[in-house]
Amino acid sequence: LEKMDDAEFAEKFQNISVYARVQPEHKTRIVNAWRNAGYVTAMTGDGVNDAPSIKAADIGIGMGITGTDVTKNVADMVLADDNFATIVGAVEEGRRIYDNIRKAIQFLLGSNMSEVLSIFFATILQPVHLLWINLVTDCFPALALGTEKAEPNIMKRKPRDAKAGIFADGMGFDIAYQGLLVTALVMVSYFIGHFMETGEWTITNSAHGTTMAFVTMSMAEIFHSMNMRSQRGSIFKLGSKNRLLFGAAAVSLLATTAVCEIPLLAGAFGFTSVEPAEYLVALLLSVLVIPIVELVKWIQRRSTR
């Protein structure tokens, strides 16, 4: 290493697997070479001589039992049990947390997009309706998505590009088409509700149509939160269950039903009582969000093979 200049070392370092008797400055040089090549680096160590390279790495890992105080202070991660296998568990947990953040963001932005479009294309819902959906219908499922367990293939994925943004890997497209999908279902529900009330297919203000649109949007977003348990995988093949998400969905559904059926709340929101047949139509429309998104996921998986 002493005899190699930087240019020569840059050509050869990727072919070297084992180093012996390296000095602290050599360790830092090795770490920097990998970082300059665009790789995410991790460095473990326990002694004072490891501190410079641990600090230089993207992820500095110190030993909690045998490590010196200097090493622990500069490390990003401290292994409390000095077990290297713990690093794998930490990487898995980090990927799970990042995945869940993306799922919650995608769910909330897709839902908000459908709400905005429902006003942009036609004034189907009023601001107070959208405020209720944002604060009650969307809030609880989004929080529950943050507790989702790691997906089965999470450790088989390639390392994520450190420069990739939160909307990478087609997330922007997913938000757009899912928002448009819910908007389309809500608009269809509005016109069906108006037709069931008047027997006419006309574009006009309709209390029944507005109520059905509200119920459909609320239930569609509740069902869509189930889609977000996995951004690409089928939710029917997940090996785990998110009981908190199911509970949050049930609470949101009960709140939506209450605001439509309790006279005091229904009057404040301008809703009318919904008949069982109308509830059934809203349910059938809103549940379509699951098979349609599953179909798109399947196409996306096929296209990336």
Explain the meaning of each model-derived region.
Residues 1-43, 57, 62-232:
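Membrane-embedded transport module
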Residues 54:
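Basic, alpha-helical nucleic-acid-binding regions used in initiation and control of genome expression
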Residues 146, 215-305:
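C-terminal transmembrane module of polytopic membrane proteins
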